Structures are given as C-alpha cells and as structure tokens.
C-alpha cells in the first residue's frame, strides 16, 4: 500500500548561470539540509529548482543569499511499489477523477519503492484516491 502525504516543496527561481546547481546543493549541504527529491529546469534567462527537503525553513535561509526567489508549493508525495505499471495506475486514477497533474517528478533505484512528487489541481483529493495503491 502506498504512503501518500501532503508536503511543501520549495520552488527556487534564480538567474541561470553555470554552477547554479553546485551553488544550491552546496548551500543546502552547508546548512545540514538533506534533499529528498529535486527537479531543475533551465527556462532561458532563469532557472527553476524544485526541492523536497528535510527542512524548508533551513532551505529558505540557505538559498536566500544566492539571490533568487523562494516559494512554497503544496505537493503530494507518494511512496509506491517499484514495479511496472504503478505510475500508469496512478495516472489513470487521477485522470478518471478529473484531476490535472501540472507537474511530476520521481526517483527510482533498485529499491522496492519509488517516490513520486506531484503538483495537481486537488492535492487533498489525490491523497484520498491513492491511499490504496
């Protein structure tokens, strides 16, 4: 059965430059913050980093000197079985319930579970829909 919860993810938006990822990850390391999930996107003149961390307050404090903007985004975090078709089951369930998935990123290794982070049109409803996946 899936472990599904509402979490707050950090969106860090900053001017794009070579080394930004290094700057961000070093700042978080120096603050003692663990990164549970990350997504990073180059949007031309700016970069967007999505960070699910062990401590959002420390994350914000650590990123502030880097000159970007820190926002909090409520997301659904689901830890599900690592097997073929698991994401298809989730995607179909959400589609059938009329829920839009605006953003998704996931991590997978050879471990028995996968962590999926989703920004949707109704996080509360998603949590209820995925409890038995």
Predicted regions: what is each one?
Residues 1-133:
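A conserved regulatory-domain signal marking ACT and ACT-like small-molecule sensing domains
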């Amino acid at each position: 059965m899936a472990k599904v919860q509402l979490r707050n993810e950090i969106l860090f938006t900053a001017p794009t430059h070579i080394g930004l990822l290094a700057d961000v990850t070093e700042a978080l390391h120096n603050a003692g913050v663990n990164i549970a999930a990350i997504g990073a996107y180059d949007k031309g003149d700016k970069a967007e980093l999505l960070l699910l961390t062990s401590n959002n307050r420390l994350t914000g404090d650590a990123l502030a000197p880097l000159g970007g903007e820190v926002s909090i985004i409520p997301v659904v975090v689901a830890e599900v079985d690592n097997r073929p078709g698991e994401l298809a089951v989730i995607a179909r369930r959400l589609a059938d319930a009329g829920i839009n998935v605006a953003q998704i990123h996931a991590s997978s290794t050879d471990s028995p579970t996968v962590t999926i982070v989703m920004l949707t049109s109704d996080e509360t409803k998603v949590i209820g829909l995925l409890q038995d996946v």
